[in-house]
């Protein structure tokens, strides 16, 4: 095997210096980063279906038979109150064939529990099965930091940056001089050819198809890891850099004054709790539907000692992409609207901040986008393998 000759190959005739250097770096960095990229892509593929797998293993609790009328929310409130339990939150799915999910505080055991309830019969379906929770926690940790804490987090971040360079340098190496050849190379795989030729076409063609999507997934990943990446993204979307945000918070601004005013109002609401009769959950749901009239999964957080208001998040999918966009509204205990924080009214950089995780994981459009992301990350997983096979053939 002539490894040295391959790693330090001579520049070809008519090959530009830029393409020559790109080729060497693509090879060296590919060999160096392949193992980490394999782990990150594989765990990303596996983690993509976490919610779907959890729903499947708890299918007897999650999915129920639909009937004509749902029970009022007050039924569940009264039912739990009789059992010395106090509701903290309630999730009402958009899909009528899914159970209501209620988190409640058990006064006797002093524990917070989450159970599925049939919205048509009122039956308590239990807390479900969490057998895969530990597995997915490990998969997530491997994906984020290779089970090595902060050190692993930075290792993953560096190699994702390397992967981004690999994608771009791969495009440089792949780009043909002739336009006719461009179309042929971009969209064809010679399936009847020999193994090494098919492997070569898979590396090039699948890499071309997935390039933009893998770049996007990679950037949204390192956005979480590195503040400077977050700054670049936010500034490019019209926001402030992280340092500028910190500096602006040091002075008294209108937004700070508004925040203080909001906090004072909440403190006054806490003091008035005894005098105010709390309206029922069904009224809150009615008011929510009045403010946010579209169909969508709704989560209601009930008031407590620290938070005197109802906080409602409703997922809006009424857009041309079907993306899951969160709208948030607050009501006080007597049903007066105190805050309306609609996704469509937020600046672009703030919208991106709120959607950065579902954009990275593929949950942004539900199961369809999760499947698409799975296929893209599967291609990302294959690139180091097919690339290594190409290199191995040359050194044999």
Question: Locations of the language-model features?
Answer:
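Conserved histidines in hydrophobic membrane contexts and catalytic metal-binding motifs
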Residues: 2-396
